[in-house]
Amino acid sequence: EKGISVFVYPAGEKAGHKTSSSYEVQKKICNSYRIPMVETVKDHKDRYDLVIDAIFGTGLSRSITGELANVISDMNGLTGKKVSVDIASGINADDGAVLGCAFRADHTITFSFGKTGQYLWPGTEYSGTVHVVPIGITNESWLGQKPRMAVLEEKDLPELLPKRNAHSNKGTYGKLLIIAGSVNMAGAACLAAK
C-alpha cells in the first residue's frame, strides 16, 4: 500500500512439509494481502532493508537445533536492519542465555516491560536497543507483585546523583569501601577504584 515490498518466510514449516493446516492458513492470509511467501530466507537476500524476527517468544526454554537453527543463522547473515518482536529468538527471557543459537537484533520491540534476559549477558548483545511498548497491562494487573529487578536509565541519574555543592570535597559525601579481589586477582578492585 505504501510502496514497500514485504516477503514472508514461514519458519516453522520445513521445506517439503508445507502441508499443515497452520501453513495453509498463513498462506491464505498472505495471498489475501498479496504478500509473497519465499521458499528460503536467502531469497532476495540483498534487497531486504528490514528483517523482522518473530519466530520464538519469551516462553522458549529448549535449545534451537536443526532447520530452525539454520534459518536463524541465515537471517543473521542478511543485510538490512534487524528487529526482534518481544525478544530475540533463541534468547532465554529469564537469564539471557543463548539457547543453541540466537537472532542478533539491532532493535527489539518488547511489550509491557523489558525482559531480564535482554539486559543480562549474553542476551543483551543479541537484543540491540530495547524499546518497551505499552500494550495496556496496568500496574494493578500484577496483583501487588513488584518486579524483582529494575533497569537504571539516564533519566534516573539526577535523582540518584544529586547536584553537588561547588565547595565540597571527596570527604563531604561519604566514603566508599571496596571489598574485592584476592591474591593475584586484583583486577576487580583496581577497576572499581578507578
Where are these regions (language model features)?
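Nucleotide and nucleotide-moiety/phosphate-recognizing core
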Residues: E1-A54, S63-V85
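Small-residue (G/A/S/T)-rich helix-start motifs and N-terminal tracts that mark the onset
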Residues: E1-E13, K18-S20, E24, Y48, ...
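Alpha-helical segments flanking ligand/cofactor-binding loops in enzyme cores
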Residues: K28, S73, G100, C190-K194
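Short gly/ser/thr-rich secondary-structure transition/capping motifs
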Residues: S32-V38, T65, S89-A93, D156-P162
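Internal gly/pro-rich beta-alpha loop/helix module
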Residues: Y48-L50, I55-P147
